[in-house]
Amino acid sequence: MTHKKQFDSPPRRVALFVTCMVDMIYPEVGMATVELLERQGVEVVFPAEQTCCGQPAFNAGFWDEARPLARRFVDIFEPLVRQKQVDAVVAPSGSCTTMTSHFYQLLLDDEPGYRERAAFLGAATFELTEFLVDVLGVTEVGARFDGRLSYHACCHLLRELGIDRQPRALLDAVEGVELVEMTGAEECCGFGGLFAIKNSGISTAMGQRKAQNIAKSDADAVALCDVSCMTHINGLLSREGQRCRAVHIAQVLTNQVDVAARPASAVSEPEVKGAPRRWQDDKVKG
């Protein structure tokens, strides 16, 4: 377990590790993350040369292929922290934060130089809600959500990082929200990266159970901290014909989710500012 860096004063400059899916598919989540941090007086820098952290290859057992990506990540972010150009690295993903802060030391165990650098960097790498609550001491961020909101605890976030109290505290402080606890909130949604491809039948069954539990909660939206789980859950909710949608917690905390934008009878999901066009396209095709 990585021991997290302690700060004598609140960090005021961080590097954003944006992650592949946020960068390529959900840039609005990355922008919401930046907005959220800047509202707290934190300057955000974005190392443009960053790439995949290597997690897909690592999880598939291709460690030799994952190591160059791990070294590159360390080479990009570690000097920024070491030279005090930034105070910390923040990512809007429990899954990728787990990879870079926990598994890099295992992956680079036979490379003493990189192993030490990875441990140093891992201590300064934080998942978004962890950084807001545990480091900045913030729970109230000026968010409002006029509707019923549930929460899905993503696996890496909960089981590897031990983060659960932090996102719940942030959501609890949202003005106007009615928080509803779904059955099995801590149960896996069935995505699991390559698991969803290699074991699609099991993955779908797990996702359907999650979608059914969400429907029973009668929530307008489900907040979570990983866009990979968000993608999987939304696919199953759409297939099940549910109007509820999963949204990243950064979108909730920056007021980008509006369930009251139009009457429920007129929409198949809550409106998300900057949402992918396919949500609207699916509605037209239907």
Predicted feature locations:
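Iron-sulfur cluster-binding electron-transfer modules in prokaryotic oxidoreductases
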Residues: M1-G286
